[in-house]
């Protein structure tokens, strides 16, 4: 008996975002089938390092989750906030330019592919070397927002010791470097490292588990990240408070993705001291950070565009304001590290020609 082919309506054939992960879509008529098999579907976590929202100090504030945008502000209100952000940023020390290098990246740079990533990694490794990341007979390394863990691969090239790598990322990543870290070590007769990959949101990461697991190893602990997006940086600082590492090196980016709910009590108090006292006011600050990395529209001159923008500012002026807003958030994080007992600094670790997101947070424990 011949099968009857079902005819779907246009609505049933429409592609819709997956409710579990908006990064991919599904045909509407297959939604129920997809939800049962989607890799992003919620699962009951039994990992010993999982504790829901352990690194978030409070629940979501309704005023932050609203659809408020800075376009809702009048020109006068916008001008008031721009004046405040200018005043705050101008009162803060600016980062120093410290573009470093590590020879472990020579071969990678000669490959010629994605060279900008290699330049960033080379400088971050140079900063790690200055903080004695590689001086030990084995260390414990946390890579936050690890992605494919390419940076950890080159940390192993620098250290060449029996290290432990704890690779933390909430997403599944293809072409991971985990196996390459092991293969490189075997090929070069280095001690074989241990690699632990944790697929987890940093907000739920109970770092105490690993601290207790390796407490008797005698190995120093270090943290780093090449691309820690927005709120993930604040969550990482919250996470590290329970078991502070010897040092941390974090390349900062995507400030427009910061969220009030992921800030610590100290960070909120510091912002309030500067005149940014609630989620909506912080939303104005973080949305303006996007101005720093907005590209020029076609046929627009850097000194133009003021008449077509809500702020009445040219593209060039908006970029300057955006950079100042980013600096306020970065400096708040620097102060947070100092509150945790670290010596800390902000540095331009690469030039703007490599990436517009070129500031790194450096922190290391004070020696009494």
Curated annotation (Swiss-Prot):
The record's catalysed reaction(s) read: cytidine(4) in tRNA(Pro) + S-adenosyl-L-methionine = 2'-O-methylcytidine(4) in tRNA(Pro) + S-adenosyl-L-homocysteine + H(+); cytidine(4) in tRNA(Gly)(GCC) + S-adenosyl-L-methionine = 2'-O-methylcytidine(4) in tRNA(Gly)(GCC) + S-adenosyl-L-homocysteine + H(+); adenosine(4) in tRNA(His) + S-adenosyl-L-methionine = 2'-O-methyladenosine(4) in tRNA(His) + S-adenosyl-L-homocysteine + H(+)
Q: Where does Zn(2+) bind?
A: 18, 24, 34, 38
Q: Any signal peptide, and if so, which residues? A: none
Query: Where in or outside the cell is it found?
Result: Cytoplasm; Nucleus, Nucleolus
GO terms for cellular component = cytosol; nucleolus; nucleus
What EC identifiers does the entry list?
A: 2.1.1.225
Gene Ontology biological-process entries: tRNA methylation
| One Gene Ontology term of the molecular function aspect | tRNA 2'-O-methyltransferase activity
Q: What is its main location?
A: cytoplasm
- Its protein name is tRNA:m(4)X modification enzyme TRM13
Q: What species is this protein from?
A: Schizosaccharomyces pombe (strain 972 / ATCC 24843)
């Amino acid at each position: 008996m011949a099968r009857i082919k079902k005819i779907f309506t246009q609505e049933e054939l429409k592609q819709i975002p997956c409710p579990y992960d908006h990064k991919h879509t599904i045909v509407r008529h297959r939604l129920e089938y997809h939800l049962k098999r989607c890799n992003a579907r919620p699962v009951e976590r039994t990992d010993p390092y999982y504790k829901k929202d352990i690194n978030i100090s409070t629940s979501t504030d309704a005023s932050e989750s609203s659809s408020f945008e800075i376009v809702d502000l009048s020109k006068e209100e916008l001008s008031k906030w721009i004046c405040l952000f200018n005043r705050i940023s101008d009162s803060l020390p600016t980062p120093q330019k410290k573009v470093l290098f590590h020879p472990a990246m020579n071969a990678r740079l000669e490959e010629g592919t994605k060279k900008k990533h290699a330049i960033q990694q080379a400088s971050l490794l140079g900063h790690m070397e200055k903080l004695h990341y590689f001086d030990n007979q084995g260390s414990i390394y946390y890579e936050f927002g690890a992605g494919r863990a390419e940076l950890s691969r080159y940390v192993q090239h620098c250290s060449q010791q029996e290290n432990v790598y704890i690779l933390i990322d909430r997403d599944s990543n293809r072409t991971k470097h985990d196996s390459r870290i092991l293969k490189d070590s075997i090929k070069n007769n280095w001690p074989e490292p241990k690699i632990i990959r944790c697929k987890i949101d940093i907000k739920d990461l109970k770092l105490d588990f690993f601290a207790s697991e390796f407490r008797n190893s005698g190995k120093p602990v270090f943290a780093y990240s090449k691309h820690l997006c927005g709120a993930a940086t604040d969550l990482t600082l919250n996470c590290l408070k329970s078991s502070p590492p010897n040092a941390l090196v974090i390349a900062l980016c995507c400030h427009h993705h910061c969220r009030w709910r992921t800030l610590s009590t100290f960070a909120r108090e510091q912002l309030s001291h500067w005149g940014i006292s609630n989620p909506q006011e912080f939303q104005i600050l973080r949305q303006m950070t996007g101005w720093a990395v907005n590209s020029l529209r076609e046929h627009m001159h850097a000194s133009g565009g003021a008449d077509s923008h809500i702020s009445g500012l040219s593209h060039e002026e908006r970029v300057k304001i955006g950079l100042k807003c980013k600096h306020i958030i970065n400096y708040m994080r620097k102060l947070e590290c100092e509150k945790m007992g670290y010596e800390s600094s902000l540095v331009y670790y690469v030039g703007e020609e490599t990436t517009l997101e070129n500031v790194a947070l450096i922190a290391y424990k004070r020696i009494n």
